[in-house]
């Protein structure tokens, strides 16, 4: 019995010693032993060259959403009814408001992006999105210009086109129109492009050396980019 107890004690001590032995060091992967470009990223988004089909699975639903929330209709502000006879546009008429403004700086960038997507994917839907809206805006210019002259009021979205007051009103949207016009020279957006270019060249605030600047939020504020 004593021998059994003795052996049990020895095995217990050996077990404790074994537990205290350091485990073999694990190799830490870093840039010193594995080039960064070979490391697997920690995020779940696949870091790879995506196919057009895979990209379109994501962006096609976005196009569908944007098409719905940026309508191209004129409504009566008081009744909310759509105006289809544009000769009846008056002081109560406005472009239907969606989630995004059709002539904003951000949407000018979006238009250019849509044209690039159409070129890269060979999908005409993206180009059609831009074409429909530019044609609509071009058609609206004479009616809302008359609105401004006759009633001294103008729809906010159309004001950015017919009475631009800042580079943000003009630059990005004008760029999108010029890009589309180069694809389709027969599309005439000169009634908008000329107004934009006149503002950019002759009316936008500049420093004495010609650098574009603006008077907000402080005098002679410059864009960092």
Can you describe what each PLM-predicted range is?
Residues 16-18:
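C-terminal motif of bacterial Sec signal peptides marking the signal peptidase cleavage site
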Residues 35-43, 102-119, 156-158, 163-182, ...:
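Well-ordered alpha-helical segments within folded domains of soluble proteins
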Residues 149-159, 212-218:
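Short linear capping/connector segments at secondary-structure termini
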């Amino acid at each position: 019995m004593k021998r059994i107890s003795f052996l049990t004690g020895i095995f217990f001590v050996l077990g404790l010693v074994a537990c205290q032995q350091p485990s073999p060091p694990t190799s830490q992967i870093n840039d010193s032993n594995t080039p960064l470009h070979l490391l697997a990223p920690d995020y779940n988004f696949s870091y790879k060259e995506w196919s057009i089909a895979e990209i379109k699975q994501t962006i096609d639903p976005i196009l569908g959403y944007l098409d719905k929330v940026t309508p191209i209709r004129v409504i009566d502000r008081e009744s909310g009814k759509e105006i289809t006879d544009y000769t009846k546009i008056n002081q109560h008429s406005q472009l239907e408001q969606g989630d995004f403004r059709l002539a904003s700086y951000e949407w000018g960038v979006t238009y250019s992006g849509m044209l690039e997507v159409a070129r890269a994917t060979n999908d005409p839907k993206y180009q059609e999105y831009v074409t429909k809206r530019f044609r609509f805006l071009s058609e609206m210019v004479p009616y809302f210009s008359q609105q401004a002259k006759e009633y001294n009021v103008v729809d906010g979205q159309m004001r950015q086109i017919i009475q631009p007051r800042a580079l943000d009103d003009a630059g990005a949207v004008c760029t999108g129109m010029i890009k589309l016009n180069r694809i389709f020279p027969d599309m005439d957006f000169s009634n908008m492009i000329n107004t934009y270019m006149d503002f950019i060249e002759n009316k936008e605030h500049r420093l004495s050396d010609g650098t574009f600047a603006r008077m907000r939020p402080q005098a002679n504020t410059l864009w960092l980019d």
